[in-house]
């Protein structure tokens, strides 16, 4: 059996397996255990009581986190006409149509969010096989197909979290950085939970919020007592 490193031994003294922590205690321990030399991301996993095989329970959407995610977000926008200046003024990293399509086809896919105005979808549609598997295909459900490209870019840059339930009905997302204070992280988590409450499918039966866990990029995970969050 491999020996534990000094860091692993330190972390193992802080984690009690099979224990559920209050959200504040869990976040405090995450910060203590975050010993990487970079500002680690704080990720959340929320197990929902849904059946994603049913179309109306295949949850996806977006929410603005009040304290942002701490990530630098690169945004590409497909649009034309007056919207070009609007997207640029809002902070888009690149704006285009056919030229942007060709750039992406050539391998330039270094973007976190791709936004499109409705009149650009004819061009964007040709990139389905490139953007789809990467989760970058614009979609009106998450606000990335819109006539208001300025607002969409601003939202993406200011800390918009796009979420989608995976095959097991689990929502994953980044809710901040280790450098954030505990109250800011807790507020972001509660806002995400509030959003998921709003989009609860009417056909979902039984317990909706089943489990909540949080972890940092290089650290351990902690199970959170659901009574300590706004469910």
Swiss-Prot record:
Q: Which domain of life is it from?
A: Bacteria
Q: Which PROSITE patterns match?
A: RIBOSOMAL_L1
Entry GO MF terms: rRNA binding; structural constituent of ribosome; tRNA binding
Q: Which GO terms describe its cellular component?
A: cytosolic large ribosomal subunit
Which InterPro entries does UniProt cross-reference here?
Ribosom_uL1_bac-type, Ribosomal_uL1, Ribosomal_uL1-like, Ribosomal_uL1/biogenesis, Ribosomal_uL1_3-a/b-sand, Ribosomal_uL1_CS
Gene3D superfamilies given for it?
3.30.190.20, 3.40.50.790
CDD domains on file:
Ribosomal_L1 (cd00403)
Give the keywords, sorted.
Repressor, Ribonucleoprotein, Ribosomal protein, RNA-binding, rRNA-binding, Translation regulation, tRNA-binding
A GO BP entry:
regulation of translation
The answer to keyword Cell wall biogenesis/degradation applying to this record is no
In the record, the note on similarity to other proteins reads: Belongs to the universal ribosomal protein uL1 family.
Quaternary state and interactors: Part of the 50S ribosomal subunit.
Q: What does this protein do?
A: Binds directly to 23S rRNA. The L1 stalk is quite mobile in the ribosome, and is involved in E site tRNA release. Protein L1 is also a translational repressor protein, it controls the translation of the L11 operon by binding to its mRNA.
What is this protein's record name?
Large ribosomal subunit protein uL1
Origin species, per record, is: Vesicomyosocius okutanii subsp. Calyptogena okutanii (strain HA)
């Amino acid at each position: 059996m491999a020996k534990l490193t000094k860091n692993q031994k330190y972390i193992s003294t802080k984690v009690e397996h099979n224990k559920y922590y209050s959200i504040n205690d869990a976040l405090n321990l995450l910060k203590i255990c975050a010993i990487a030399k970079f500002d680690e991301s704080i990720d959340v996993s929320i197990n929902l009581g849904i059946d994603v095989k049913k179309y109306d329970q295949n949850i996806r959407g977006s929410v603005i986190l009040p304290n942002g995610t701490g990530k630098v977000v690169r945004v590409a926008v497909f649009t034309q006409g007056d919207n070009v200046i609007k997207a640029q003024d809002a902070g888009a990293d690149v704006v285009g149509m056919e030229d942007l399509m060709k750039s992406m086809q050539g391998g330039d896919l270094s973007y976190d969010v791709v936004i499109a105005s409705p009149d650009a979808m004819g061009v964007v549609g040709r990139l389905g096989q490139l953007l789809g598997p990467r989760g970058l295909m614009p979609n009106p459900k998450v606000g990335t197909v819109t006539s208001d490209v300025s607002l969409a870019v601003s939202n993406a840059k200011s800390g918009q979290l796009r979420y989608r339930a995976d095959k097991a009905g689990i929502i994953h997302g980044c809710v901040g950085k280790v450098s954030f204070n505990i109250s800011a992280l807790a507020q972001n988590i509660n806002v995400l939970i509030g959003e998921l409450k709003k989009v609860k499918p009417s056909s979902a039966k039984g317990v909706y919020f089943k489990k909540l866990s949080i972890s940092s990029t290089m650290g351990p995970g902690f199970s959170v007592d659901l009574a300590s969050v706004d469910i």
